[in-house]
Amino acid sequence: MEVLMAERADLVFHNKAIDGTAMKRLISRLIDHFGMAYTSHILDQVKTLGFRQATLTSISLGIDDLLTTPSKGWLVQDAEQQSLILEKHHHYGNVHAVEKLRQSIEIWYATSEYLRQEMNPNFRMTDPFNPVYIMSFSGARGNASQVHQLVGMRGLMSDPQGQMIDLPIQSNLREGLSLTEYTISCYGARKGVVDTAVRTSDAGYLTRRLVEVVQHIVVRRTDCGTIRGISVSPRNGVGVTERIFIQTLIGRVLANDVYMGLRCIATRNQDIGIGLVNRFITSRAQPIYIRSPFTCRSTSWICQLCYGRSTTHGNLVELGEAVGIIAGQSIGEPGTQLTLRTFHTGGVFTGGIAEHVRAPSNGKIKFNEDLVHPTRTRHGHPAFLCHIDLHVTIESQDIIHKVNIPPKSFLLVQNDQYVESEQVIAEIRAGTSTLKERVQKHIYSDSEGEMHWSTDVYHTPEYTHGNVHLLPKTSHLWVLSGSPCRSSIVPFPLHKDQDQMNVQSLYVEERYISDLSMNNDRVRHKLFGWDQKRGRVSYYSGPDRIISNRNWDSIYPLILHENSDLLAKRRRNRFIIPFQYDQEQEKELRPPGIVIKIPIKGILRRNSILAYFDDPRYRRSSSGIAKYGTIEVDSIIKKEDLIEYRKTREFGPKYQIQIKVNRFFFIPEEVHILPRSSSIMVRNNSIIGVDTRITLNIRSQVGGLVRVEKKKKRIELKISSGDIHFPGETDNIARYSGILIPPGRVKNTESKFKNWIYVQRITPIKKKYFVSVRPVVTYEIADGINLATFFPQDLLQEKNNLQLRVVNYILYGDGKPIRGIFHTSIQLVRTCLVLNWDQDRAGSIEEEEAYTSLAEVRVNDLIRNFIRIDLVKSPISSTGKENDMAGSGLIPNNGSDRINTNPFFSKAKTQSLSQHQGTIRTLLNRNKEGQGESLMVLSSSNCSRIGPLNGSKYHNVTKESIQEDPMISIRNSLGPLGTVPNILNFSSSYHSITHNEILFNKYLLPDNSRETFLVPKSYFMDENRRIYNLDPCSNIILTPFNLNWCFLHHDYWEDTSTIISLGQFLCENICISKDGPCVKSGQIIIVHVDSLVIRLAKYHLATRGATVHGHYGEILYEGDTLVTFIYEKSRSGDITQGLPKVEQVLEVRSIDSISMNLEKRVEGWNERITGFLGIPWEFFISAQLTIVQSRISLVNKIQKVYRSQGVQIHNRHIETIVRQITSKVLVSEDGMSNVFSPRELIGLLRAERIGRALEDDICYRAILLGITRASLNTQSFISEASFQETTRVLAKAALRSRIDWLKGLKENVVLGGMIPVGTGFKGFVHHSREHNNISLEIKKKNLFDGKMRDILFYHREFCGSCIPKNFHDTSEQ
């Protein structure tokens, strides 16, 4: 006792917290020094001490103990400010989505981390005895991360795909979460709870499978006599590798003598302790060969020396020890442990932050610019990258600071920039590389439109048939707005003139800027083609009359005044835009409601309707029946007005009435169409009052008689107001049933009717009939609605052979029910303007057509719009066979003789337009003072350029006349395009009406203009501000809502005219005028003298290496993938990946890259080894090499996962398992011997022995079995049956008459025998002669094995050339 006291006095007193790792070390040192019994006694005392102290403290935890860190408020505010700036950068296209996500995550992660670091000192200063503080740093359950969620902030969470949600949870659990935060955190938290349970069971099952594989492996011999070994060499590096080197060596047995120079420092079969390892490290001995379970020659057990020391007591393992089961549990148990440890952070994300270099003081920074080159940081900021050490000087007033910036760092400031003290000037690349994985992030288009990019994208796709383009450098991708029009499946449109159609079948004509008089086959081929790629047929209207004749399917709206607001109505996809004028001019203009109809090609036949006017006097808001009364109708012309292709066909005839007495009648009634299932609260033929409830949520608007009619799928309920008469015998009102009666016609009735009435006789079932007398609304059709009030006077005069007539249409037939849709009005009469002209001569082959187009003339600063109507003759080809030709799908040969197919862009070479008569007539905007009328009529004979008009203050008009070459003409007219009258020369090659300019982008001109007939990649605009893309495979329509008008102040315009060019892209908030920045981003498509038209566009930034999907000019729909970024993401290092990863490796699933690599390696080895050794050895050696290589690779992979978690498992446990996975080979079919059948699985050692015994080649190849398969391919069928598939295994064993020698543990447990381990082991050892003669056998084999070893395993040069280094180096982790 005194001795002990004296020793204790000499001991050093350590006042330091001891954690789990330190405790492990202490216990292992105690065991080394004092042995097991004494150590357990000491540990008991430690346990007692701990429990006693814990009971004395008696900590309780209350909600008031959770104190939030005071600095949280400004930290969160600061992070939000940074996020807002980042959002703006993203919006303006300075950073792309990945950079934004990355930076956002780092901002919030840094905030969260800073809060977590603040938490500890805050508690220590304010409340050191706070229970939360004591618990969280006690090392027991609960750690800083969990406490941080209670009192700091929860931070960023993962979504179900494992991606980061860049909306952080700013609250902590003490403050409580908002609804959004709760929803975001639900997934992570639930995942934590569920995963803990699931992974625990997974780890348990993994343990079970592992034990199943190796349960029969017991130490049964002292030495198997192997001379193989695994080479381990200490690396030159220190730190990690040295630690792993020590762990690998301790407890192993040497396979060879180790020499230092000529002196032997360790002998074969000597076990290695810490002292010997240190000598190896200091002496830098050459590779040391150790024995391992891989090298053991025994088939179904293991020898003492190959296993090495036991981990429990530090001596060589005892005979009879069940090392297999220990190995299985050693690997399986940490899985359980790790699982439990992982998810208690509730799915909260963790990341890493780079180190920063800050300026020591205020001053000007200077560095050598030649040593750096510009780059982008991973957050998208501009920076300089330095490859070598960079010396930076910061000059303040009185002192010069020198800062050294390490290589591969980012410099975030420019040369000669003024920096403030503590400003971040550089970012240092993190020294340790974390686990990273490459992730793809797709960016999707959020609008419809057309893809556009600059020259920075490779226009040729990466693969020959793909549409994937690579970006060589950072650039913007633009999506130009516009609503695409999908083509129909029907190759030929079956619609007639003015039909209303669904959008799906709307055909958009492709406009070609090609000279149609050239008989070019390629032109004809392009005009009409099947678009097979998209699985639908696009219909391209060609120059042929028949095809174009069938293509009148859409009414194009006209925008007649640039500053007018557009009110667009879509009625059954017929685009009709009524005009809204400036308020002060409204009184003078024609009444609103006139709509001008121009067919899709702008071609009017005779008797075409040019405009129509809906008079508000003939408008009803209720349903009813139209009646023509007893008036004689001269002629009724029917036009089929509506065709729908949805299995039903409805015809709404248009009736053109020319009547002697211009009067018709409307019988109002209230109609409700109800579903068949609805419950009706009124009876048929009953009389109800106003506001009576009909169904649960519908009330009647009028009172009267109710008629209920039940149809197949619906119920029709009509309420007709009026009087009910039960006629007596004297009354003759019943005779007039079903007709209109004028006032005073009915006699002998009690009441006289002052207005027209409609009599209806109703006979209910089994009841007396009665008569309903209904009031009638009478409409007089005003005979001469004076259209001169709508149009200027000269428009109606017959001039130049063109006539306009006014015609009234009644839109509903006699007796037809008119159904009003809820809250919409019904137009009963439409006044139309019909265009007509005299045919030249009766039998003319050429039929005349009227071409309409729009011209714009500026008079006295008012923009005037003209409709221009030209008569053009066109050849008719075989009118009789019209339908056949259309059905055959052939374009006749004379199809390209017709010149002026396209009214908006005609290139007339054979016929000049001046041969035809034409008028340009004004339509609106008559000046208040009536000035400028002299310009109103222009014929094409005086279509030379008209200079600036009187009173016009713009003089920068382009003066050049248009050249013959269209390319030059385009460039010439691209100045400020505000040519005032904008009626250009009709030269023989180029004819333009306003807004039809071809737009060029400087990027778009191809290198070789071989396709001469097609002007390269341009846009064509018609007068409706619709833009046609000349790609034969796509249709796009721009509605006016996709355009943005930008008015420039005139004085400023002259200075900036150089900046703005047609086709240029403007980003958002770029200043182009005095009024302020341009708010929207887009492409300039029209340049006027004082205004621009910008086609709206969204732009996306893409950096180098990104993949662009789709082709240039391709139509994109919402949600299409635009671009894919590939970026590196640090992998979360927890066992989320760990446990499944371990399982994946052990089950040898091919998802992982390991099996792929192994296959490639094996092929390489086979080739090389055949060269070295010749054919006979090929199979034997390549199988051996494959097995050795894959074993080491598997061990390293499993160790990597566990080490990343700080879990240490001795290599020999993993080796024991891996040995079983790789212990089988597959017999090949070629060179097959008589012993085994092809594709049979046999043990590797057994194959070698039988091969030697028979002196015959058995060809086999290495195979990796998963742990499950290995468990089902053992020597014991009882063990297999008790694991899985019991019936199948037992049935097979019975059929094959298998014998179970009961060598393993499990089969003995199942049958209740003695287990062959521990004390029961001795009964199973049979000392055979083979065992006694081991030393002799070694001598015989030694010569050959030595040579083999030199060739295969340890020869440095050879191994270096064909085997990766980790083949002979377990130290590479």
From Swiss-Prot:
Cofactor: binding details: Binds 1 Zn(2+) ion per subunit.
Annotated Zn(2+) binding sites: C224, C296, C303, C306
Gene Ontology annotations of biological process type: DNA-templated transcription
Keywords: Chloroplast, DNA-directed RNA polymerase, Metal-binding, Nucleotidyltransferase, Plastid, Transcription, Transferase, Zinc
EC number(s) from the headed UniProt entry: 2.7.7.6
Cofactor: Zn(2+)
SUPFAM superfamilies: beta and beta-prime subunits of DNA dependent RNA-polymerase (SSF64484)
Localisation: Plastid, Chloroplast
Catalytic activity: RNA(n) + a ribonucleoside 5'-triphosphate = RNA(n+1) + diphosphate
Protein family per UniProt: Belongs to the RNA polymerase beta' chain family. RpoC2 subfamily.
Function: DNA-dependent RNA polymerase catalyzes the transcription of DNA into RNA using the four ribonucleoside triphosphates as substrates.
Name the UniProt record assigns to this protein: DNA-directed RNA polymerase subunit beta''
Organism: Amborella trichopoda
